[in-house]
From Swiss-Prot:
InterPro entries referenced in this protein's UniProt entry, alphabetically: 7TM_chemorcpt
UniProt GO MF annotations: ionotropic bitter taste receptor activity; ionotropic sweet taste receptor activity; ligand-gated monoatomic ion channel activity; taste receptor activity
The protein, known as: Putative gustatory receptor 59c
Membrane spanning residue stretches: 4-24, 40-60, 76-96, 167-187, 260-280, 285-305, 373-393
Gene name as annotated: Gr59c
One GO CC term on file: membrane
Extracellular-side segments: 25-39, 97-166, 281-284, 394-397
Tissue occurrence: Expressed is restricted to taste hairs in the labial palps. In larva, is expressed in neurons of the terminal external chemosensory organ.
Record topology, Cytoplasmic segments: 1-3, 61-75, 188-259, 306-372
Physiological role: Probable gustatory receptor which mediates acceptance or avoidance behavior, depending on its substrates.
UniProt entry keywords in alphabetical sequence: Cell membrane, Membrane, Receptor, Transducer, Transmembrane, Transmembrane helix
Length: 397
């Protein structure tokens, strides 16, 4: 029987190689990442060709500069800004992946070693569901976005326009693949956190059972407490190493995170604004037909779901750390104290969690948290309302 998740990972891996996002190979027998000559040459040629096409595109008659001069509607100016932001985000991300390639390979192999020690991570229901959902909505978002671009320009299709749309579709695909690789790495880290939580819950239950032992002068009680203390120290060591890998990943994906924030901000504004423009008049190319509006609704819904999965995955890390605190706090409900060594092990682990919490800052500009996300959504809605009001006023005049 075909393993759906393994098939999805294979498709993502080969697709990442094909579009020049991955500049190293993975041995599927061992899972080890290595930099090979053929992959390096292919990725370098692909990226250089892409940059050359972008330069030629901006020097031609249909460049962003010429379109900016000939634009008549506000939504045309806005989508040129979106295109410029997306191009800049892709180029910055690709450049980052070249000069930090050795770090990408090292963190890949380190995460792989952790997963190899805990193979139940890849067999977990949450892990499989997360990968399948991301694949479905990423494919839907990418496909519907391409169909929307072609449908909006269907009345003036030319050879130059086909090249332009193909180039923009390639950029969109590259950006989505970069986000997908970040997502897959975070899913594996969260899977490791879930295994860590399971082991900690089991240990706390065992410690609670030990509390019921009345005769504490015998050797059985001391041996059991020492055994649990050793297990807790190992769990704390696993958490420290996993947290260290997570901090390195956060530092490694700084440019990609900033690019994601900018692209998602403008794309969310653009999808709402473009929907309103399609209803107001037919200059967008959809002509407000039922099929056109249905395409907009489906494209917007899949785009938002894909974005939400990519953004929310980072918040799950903080949720797992908060859950570690709550599980350790259950120790205070025990009706009797434990052995001194086991109590010290619990206190040391709590101190480690309190002093080494994961805080993710995007290029030192702002901290990624749910409150910040709500503020960004509020800003998106406010700016979109301003654009829509301006469009309605000019449409009436």
């Amino acid at each position: 029987m075909v393993d759906l998740v393994k098939t999805i990972l294979l498709i993502a891996y080969w697709y990442g190689l094909a579009v020049g996002v991955s500049n190293f190979e993975v041995d599927w027998l061992t899972g080890e990442a290595i930099a090979t000559r053929r992959t390096t040459i292919y990725a370098a040629v692909h990226n250089a060709s892409l940059i050359t096409l972008l330069i030629l595109f901006n020097l031609g008659n249909n460049s962003l500069k010429s379109e900016f001069i000939s634009a008549r509607y506000l939504h045309e100016y806005f989508f040129m800004l979106m295109t410029a932001v997306r191009i800049s985000a892709v180029l910055l991300s690709l450049i980052t992946r070249w000069y930090q390639r050795s770090r990408f390979i090292r963190i890949w192999n380190q995460i792989l070693a952790l997963v190899r020690d805990r193979p139940q991570v890849v067999r977990g229901r949450w892990y499989r569901r997360s990968i399948i959902l991301k694949f479905v909505f990423c494919v839907l978002s990418d496909s519907l976005h391409t169909i929307s671009d072609v449908s909006a320009q269907r009345k003036r299709i030319t050879a130059d326009l086909i090249v332009k749309l193909s180039l923009l579709a390639t950029l969109t695909t590259i950006f989505n693949m970069i986000v997908c690789q970040y997502y897959l790495a975070m899913v594996q880290v969260i899977g490791l956190y879930k295994i860590l939580l399971q082991d900690l819950r089991c240990l706390v239950r065992q410690a609670e059972c030990i509390c019921s032992i009345r005769n504490r002068r015998g050797g059985v009680y001391s041996i059991q407490c020492c055994s649990l203390a050793d297990q807790l120290d190992l769990i704390a060591e696993r958490h420290y190493f996993l947290k260290d890998r997570l901090d390195e990943m956060s530092d490694l994906f700084q440019i990609q995170s900033l690019s994601m924030s900018l692209v998602y901000f403008f794309s969310t504004m653009g999808s709402i604004y473009f929907s309103v423009c399609s209803i107001l008049y037919s200059s967008t190319g959809f002509g407000s037909t039922y099929w056109g509006l249905l395409l907009i609704v489906l494209s917007t819904a899949s785009f938002y779901m894909d974005n939400w999965l990519s953004v929310n995955i980072g918040f799950h890390i903080r949720d797992q750390q908060d859950e570690l605190f709550r599980v350790l706090a259950d120790r205070t409900l025990f009706y009797r104290e434990l052995d001194n060594r086991l109590e010290a092990a619990f206190e040391n682990f709590q101190l480690q969690l309190a002093s080494n919490r994961h805080e993710f800052y995007v290029m030192g500009l702002f901290k990624m948290e749910r409150g910040r996300l709500i503020a960004m959504l509020s800003s998106v809605i406010t700016h979109t309302m301003v654009l829509v009001q301006w469009e309605i006023q000019n449409d009436e005049s």
